[in-house]
Amino acid sequence: PFAGVTSYLGTTGADPIEEIKTCIRAADQVSEEDPEGAQLLGVHLEGPFINPVYKGMQKEECCLLPDVTVMEDLYNTFKNKKLCRHMTIAPERPGADAVLRFCQEHQIQTAVGHSAATFEEIKKMRAYGLGGFTHTFSGMKGFHHRELGTAGAALYFDDMICEFAKQTGMTVSHEAFELAYRIKGSSRIVLTTDCCGLAQTQSCFDHYVRKIRFVKDGDQVCLEHYDGKKEWIDPRDYQAVKQVEMSYAQSVNN
């Protein structure tokens, strides 16, 4: 493709259960129709079993305690069960162990996100198949030298993948990302994108939520922050980006 991605996981949020089911049915329909363009590999359930303390932009009233009955209901909504590929969960919340066991038994990948989990809680729950971290450092308990927290666990466990969303330096500083990259390496870091705005546009794009303007500047992209700060991104050195992109494709296809 000229822009965007070759494949993706359709992602739900912490929404009312019926809205999540509507998204699942839509994913089934897209999978059956197999339209031209990027391939739908499956669905990522980013909630509803997340911690409201770290809800981020999710709906607090829809952040539910992990409930295996609700999980079974969501899973059974899928006509094509193979589309239920990935779930983000707060493993410290009561009931998470049963949901994680269910996911493990049904080959559903799980990741820590929107979570206040301690290092020890994640260490314990790894036995239930936790494989990574969703938008690492954002929406999770931070690092302390006496209690590593969720962020520290993300760096510590070599076999767990750290996903970073839209790494522009806005939600995670460049230095924090570089620190993670030094520790984890390209094979254990993945980048995801919502690919909005700038793709194939000939003019600037205003991201009103992030308060930033994306402007094409020759072969580069200029990020003009509303506070006056400017940054330039040179996409020509694609090899380093390709390494982390492919690690994501491989992770969801395993």
Language model region names:
Residues N51-N76:
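Conserved phosphate-binding/catalytic loop of the ribokinase/pfkB sugar-kinase fold
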Residues E121-N253:
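Active-site-adjacent C-terminal substructures of enzyme catalytic domains
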